[in-house]
Curated annotation (Swiss-Prot):
Cited Gene3D superfamilies: DksA, coiled-coil domain
Pfam family, one: zf-dskA_traR
Chain ranges of zinc fingers (dksA C4-type): 43-67
A molecular function GO annotation: zinc ion binding
Alphabetic keyword roster: Metal-binding, Zinc, Zinc-finger
A Gene Ontology biological process term: positive regulation of secondary metabolite biosynthetic process
Domain of life: Bacteria
Name of the protein: Uncharacterized protein HI_1497
Keyword Metal-binding carried by entry: yes
SUPFAM superfamilies: Glucocorticoid receptor-like (DNA-binding domain) (SSF57716)
């Protein structure tokens, strides 16, 4: 079952990248980045809040650093 879930997560990631790609070339203003960071977001893997510093560095992040590292390493 985990393999199916991994495949679904990878497909979701690819779809999100395709959807977001046209917008990634657009620079966000500092105010927009601040608004995203202050609004907060939950990690799509563990459900914990994504730290403000991560959202400031990557406003489009949908995983916390730890879960992103695990995902990239295939855990």
């Amino acid at each position: 079952m985990a393999d199916v879930l991994d495949q679904l997560n990878e497909r979701e990631e690819a779809l999100l990248q395709n959807i977001l790609a046209p917008h990634l070339d657009t620079e966000l203003s500092d105010d927009e980045v601040d608004a995203i960071a202050e609004a907060g977001r939950q990690c799509s893997e563990c459900g914990l809040p994504i730290p403000t510093t991560r959202l400031r560095a990557n406003p489009f992040a949908h995983r916390c650093v730890s879960c992103q590292q695990d995902w990239e390493e295939g855990r």
